[in-house]
Amino acid sequence: MKVIFVADLHYALKQFDWLLGNAASFDAVIIGGDLLDLGSDLHLDLQIVVVEKYLRLLRQKSLLMVTSGNHDGDNRNEADESVARWIRESKAEGLFVDGDSLELAGALVTLCPWWDGTVTRAELEAQLARARQSVQGRWIWIRHAPPAGSPVCWTGHQFAGDESLLEWIQRFTPDMVFSGHIHNAPFYAGGSW
């Protein structure tokens, strides 16, 4: 199985175009969060319309998995935490999103949403506990932020990983975790891809 994982596209349409042009070369395409750009002058609602079109086209070329990142929130929950409702609403045939788990080449792949506070953190923890019951072989997580202490969370000045994710890895023991979020980690001594 041939899979491509990307993250942190931040509404860079040339990167979405490249991905669209190459998606058919892969059995699965995984986008690990930050599809949108909160710092853009273009309103999020307009970015969402364009990115949803890319997602529709991508899922026609390859199995597509998408998780949210800290730039993708378009709504607030009851606890005033950022949530990417638009990603969950984009779910369609061939497109798996936040909260889903699917079998892929003998492994269970769990798509973990961005958490922004105690409520969304507890929801993700419950999702992982439920998914753990279905694991029969390997277990892979897709999560925007990397675990605390890992080389891919090094910013050049500090480790900026997710402490909760590290705890969950120790508790639930997935075989692999794909993440993005820290853009410059590969370019610093002590960092990594």
Predicted feature locations:
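Short, solvent-exposed loop/turn segments at secondary-structure junctions
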Residues: 13, 38-39, 149-151, 186
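Conserved catalytic scaffold of divalent metal-dependent phosphoesterases
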Residues: 72-164
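Core catalytic region of metal-dependent phosphoesterases/phosphodiesterases
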Residues: 11-104
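Short, Asp-centered acidic motifs that coordinate Mg2+ and/or phosphate
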Residues: 27-28, 65, 138-140, 175-176
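Extreme N-terminal starter segment of soluble prokaryotic enzymes
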Residues: 1-4
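Conserved beta-sheet core of the metallophosphoesterase superfamily
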Residues: 65, 154-193
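Short, conserved loop/helix-junction motifs that constitute active-site signature segments
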Residues: 23-24, 55-61, 133-135, 169-172, ...
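Active-site metal-binding loops of divalent metal-dependent hydrolases
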Residues: 7-10, 33-36, 70-72, 100, ...
